Protein backbone atom coordinates (compact mmCIF):
# COMPACT_ATOMS: atom_id res chain seq x y z
CA UNK A 1 0.00 0.00 0.00
CA UNK A 2 1.30 3.43 -0.83
CA UNK A 3 1.65 5.81 2.07
CA UNK A 4 -0.74 8.70 1.40
CA UNK A 5 2.21 11.09 1.21
CA UNK A 6 3.96 8.98 -1.41
CA UNK A 7 6.31 6.61 0.43
CA UNK A 8 5.68 2.87 0.29
CA UNK A 9 5.90 1.41 3.78
CA UNK A 10 3.23 -1.23 4.40
CA UNK A 11 3.22 -4.31 2.23
CA UNK A 12 0.43 -6.85 2.06
CA UNK A 13 1.42 -10.49 2.59
CA UNK A 14 -1.68 -12.62 2.23
CA UNK A 15 -4.12 -10.89 4.53
CA UNK A 16 -1.48 -9.67 6.98
CA UNK A 17 0.04 -6.20 6.90
CA UNK A 18 3.68 -6.05 7.88
CA UNK A 19 6.64 -3.71 7.93
CA UNK A 20 9.31 -6.40 7.96
CA UNK A 21 12.13 -4.16 6.81
CA UNK A 22 11.48 -1.84 9.76
CA UNK A 23 11.22 -4.56 12.42
CA UNK A 24 14.92 -4.82 13.16
CA UNK A 25 16.80 -4.69 16.47
CA UNK A 26 16.76 -0.88 16.48
CA UNK A 27 12.96 -0.94 16.02
CA UNK A 28 12.48 -2.97 19.20
CA UNK A 29 15.07 -0.89 21.08
CA UNK A 30 13.10 2.29 20.27
CA UNK A 31 9.81 0.63 21.26
CA UNK A 32 11.34 -0.58 24.54
CA UNK A 33 12.59 2.95 25.27
CA UNK A 34 9.06 4.32 24.87
CA UNK A 35 7.66 1.55 27.08
CA UNK A 36 10.32 2.22 29.74
CA UNK A 37 9.41 5.92 29.74
CA UNK A 38 5.71 5.05 30.04
CA UNK A 39 6.46 2.75 32.97
CA UNK A 40 8.40 5.54 34.69
CA UNK A 41 5.49 7.92 34.15
CA UNK A 42 3.10 5.51 35.91
CA UNK A 43 4.92 6.36 39.15
CA UNK A 44 3.33 9.84 38.95
CA UNK A 45 0.16 9.21 36.91
CA UNK A 46 -2.36 6.44 36.32
CA UNK A 47 -1.74 3.82 33.65
CA UNK A 48 -4.77 5.18 31.80
CA UNK A 49 -3.42 8.75 31.83
CA UNK A 50 -0.02 7.57 30.59
CA UNK A 51 -1.68 5.51 27.86
CA UNK A 52 -3.69 8.54 26.73
CA UNK A 53 -0.49 10.59 26.55
CA UNK A 54 1.26 7.89 24.52
CA UNK A 55 -1.67 7.60 22.12
CA UNK A 56 -1.78 11.38 21.68
CA UNK A 57 1.97 11.53 21.07
CA UNK A 58 1.78 8.73 18.52
CA UNK A 59 -1.15 10.38 16.73
CA UNK A 60 0.64 13.72 16.68
CA UNK A 61 3.81 12.17 15.28
CA UNK A 62 1.78 10.28 12.65
CA UNK A 63 0.15 13.56 11.59
CA UNK A 64 3.60 15.19 11.36
CA UNK A 65 4.98 12.25 9.39
CA UNK A 66 2.03 12.43 7.02
CA UNK A 67 2.38 16.20 6.57
CA UNK A 68 5.99 15.74 5.48
CA UNK A 69 4.75 13.88 2.40
CA UNK A 70 2.53 16.67 1.05
CA UNK A 71 3.15 20.02 -0.62
CA UNK A 72 0.25 21.81 1.12
CA UNK A 73 -2.73 21.41 3.43
CA UNK A 74 -5.20 20.99 0.58
CA UNK A 75 -3.28 18.01 -0.80
CA UNK A 76 -3.03 16.56 2.69
CA UNK A 77 -6.74 17.12 3.29
CA UNK A 78 -7.59 15.30 0.08
CA UNK A 79 -5.87 12.19 1.46
CA UNK A 80 -7.15 12.54 5.04
CA UNK A 81 -9.33 9.40 5.14
CA UNK A 82 -6.73 7.32 3.31
CA UNK A 83 -4.13 8.50 5.82
CA UNK A 84 -6.34 7.64 8.81
CA UNK A 85 -7.07 4.21 7.33
CA UNK A 86 -3.35 3.61 6.79
CA UNK A 87 -2.36 4.37 10.38
CA UNK A 88 -5.40 2.64 11.92
CA UNK A 89 -4.63 -0.54 9.95
CA UNK A 90 -1.06 -0.52 11.22
CA UNK A 91 -2.06 0.13 14.82
CA UNK A 92 -4.76 -2.53 14.63
CA UNK A 93 -2.30 -5.16 13.43
CA UNK A 94 0.20 -4.30 16.17
CA UNK A 95 -2.49 -4.19 18.87
CA UNK A 96 -3.96 -7.52 17.76
CA UNK A 97 -0.52 -9.13 17.74
CA UNK A 98 0.26 -7.87 21.23
CA UNK A 99 -3.17 -8.85 22.58
CA UNK A 100 -2.73 -12.34 21.14
CA UNK A 101 0.70 -12.60 22.80
CA UNK A 102 -0.78 -11.54 26.16
CA UNK A 103 -3.66 -14.02 25.78
CA UNK A 104 -1.25 -16.88 25.02
CA UNK A 105 1.22 -15.89 27.75
CA UNK A 106 -1.09 -14.30 30.30
CA UNK A 107 0.25 -16.07 33.39
CA UNK A 108 3.89 -15.53 32.46
CA UNK A 109 3.40 -11.86 31.52
CA UNK A 110 1.12 -10.97 34.43
CA UNK A 111 2.50 -13.15 37.25
CA UNK A 112 3.90 -10.10 39.04
CA UNK A 113 0.69 -8.06 38.71
CA UNK A 114 -0.34 -6.76 42.12
CA UNK A 115 -3.94 -5.66 41.42
Each language-model region and where it sits:
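Solvent-exposed interaction surfaces and binding hotspots enriched for charged
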Residues: 19-115
